[in-house]
Amino acid sequence: MTEYILLLVGTVLVNNFVLVKFLGLCPFMGVSKKLETAIGMGLATTFVLTLASVCAYLVESYVLRPLGIEYLRTMSFILVIAVVVQFTEMVVHKTSPTLYRLLGIFLPLITTNCAVLGVALLNINENHNFIESIIYGFGAAVGFSLVLILFASMRERIAAADVPVPFRGASIAMITAGLMSLAFMGFTGLVK
């Protein structure tokens, strides 16, 4: 049980996929201008990342390895992620049309979010079992959502602040992301 908690804390805080592994930077910068959009994207990505990790583990364990076709891993994982994202898009469209409109193009772009494919591939490379795959995918998703929501709330506050002209826009966003990354580095010694 302790190793599961350490895996969860490690993926959320210590080895955050956005701030440490630099995966998922496109939605991190693109969807983080408004807090409500960031929350919606975080929830959708949490669902997709967790489900894609589970599906990728199952495809790897019960299709690719038994047939000896591990070289098709990346292509099969992209197909799995595309199916999971389409399912998520249908669910969001039915349950929350407002959120569906707010997320716009970013919802189908979860398919090309490198964090989703990265988590699936790292899951397999680290030889996680089924439970660890679920925890790893969920922890990565919670870490992504946490960083996205924190960054969106900071960007909203910065938008209301008097920022010097040369630092407005992407410049101050990159500086803020760098400072967030430094703050998350404080968790480095928490989990080995």
UniProtKB/Swiss-Prot annotation:
Transmembrane intervals: 5-25, 39-59, 67-87, 102-122, 134-154, 171-191
Enzyme nomenclature, EC number: 7.-.-.-
Membrane protein topology class: Multi-pass membrane protein
Main subcellular localisation: membrane
Keywords: Cell inner membrane, Cell membrane, Electron transport, Membrane, Translocase, Transmembrane, Transmembrane helix, Transport
Enzyme class at the top of the EC tree: translocase
Biological process according to GO: electron transport chain
Localization annotation: Cell inner membrane
Record bears the keyword Transcription regulation: no
Any one GO cellular component localisation term in the record: plasma membrane
PANTHER family the UniProt entry points to: INTEGRAL MEMBRANE PROTEIN OF SOXR-REDUCING COMPLEX, ION-TRANSLOCATING OXIDOREDUCTASE COMPLEX SUBUNIT A
Oligomeric and partner information: The complex is composed of six subunits: RnfA, RnfB, RnfC, RnfD, RnfE and RnfG.
HAMAP family xrefs: RsxA_RnfA
Family listed: Belongs to the NqrDE/RnfAE family.
Function, as annotated: Part of a membrane-bound complex that couples electron transfer with translocation of ions across the membrane.
Record protein name field: Ion-translocating oxidoreductase complex subunit A
Organism: Vibrio campbellii (strain ATCC BAA-1116)
